[in-house]
Structure formats: structure tokens, C-alpha cells
Amino acid sequence: MTKTAIAVFSDPKSGGDEALGRLFNALILTLELKEKSQEVDLIFQGAGTRWPAEIVKAAHPANALYMAVADRIAGVCGGCADIFCAREGAEASGLDLIRNRDVPGTSGVIDLSRYLEEGWRLVAL
């Protein structure tokens, strides 16, 4: 069975359709893999840590899709959320802030290399 980690880096503050498109593609791929009973983790990384505060809103166009894959969301990069001023929104979304890798100048980040070491595919959007 394949294992896929999908990291959302796109920034909702960019104001463009591309960022929203990348989010939708990440959510859709997560849903497709979930429906095929494959192991999949969705991660919010970098400026993408700003998304959780937005997509938990019922009026957001990606909310229904987000809710459909909520059980496959591994969490939000804690150090990234700090750097991109997204910690409060990420915490309010109820998602876990993950800081399992010490990186100088941060409060800790998600260790993406763990996924590669364990044979996961990594998709960055």
C-alpha cells in the first residue's frame, strides 16, 4: 500500500486564484487517496499554515472538502505558524501544532524527512 504526505505551502494571503487552486488540489488528492483506502497525511506548512483559520469557516468554498478529509490532517507546522503569524488561527481551528524537529531560529517544525525515511511519497502544493 502506498503512503502519501501532502504538504500545503500556498498562501491564502496572496490574494490569487493559484493559492486557492493549490489548496483545492491538495484537499481533492487527499480525498481521492482516502477513498481508495490509502494512507495519506495532509500537512499545512510554511505560509500554508494560514489556511486552517480560513477553511474552518462554513462559508469558505473549501470547507465541505476540508470537513471530508479532516480525519486525514496530520497537523500544522508549529514553527511555521509562529513565523507566518498563523498560530492563533491554527489553534482555533482545532488542528495539532507539530514541532517534532528542532530547527535553529524556530520553535520547532514538522519533520518532513521522516516521511521520506519511512517510504512515503511527498507532494508539495
Show where each model-derived region lies.
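Structural motif
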Residues: 3-6, 40-41, 73-75, 96, ...
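Low-complexity intrinsically disordered segments
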Residues: 102-105, 110
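Short internal beta-strands
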Residues: 30, 40-45, 74-80
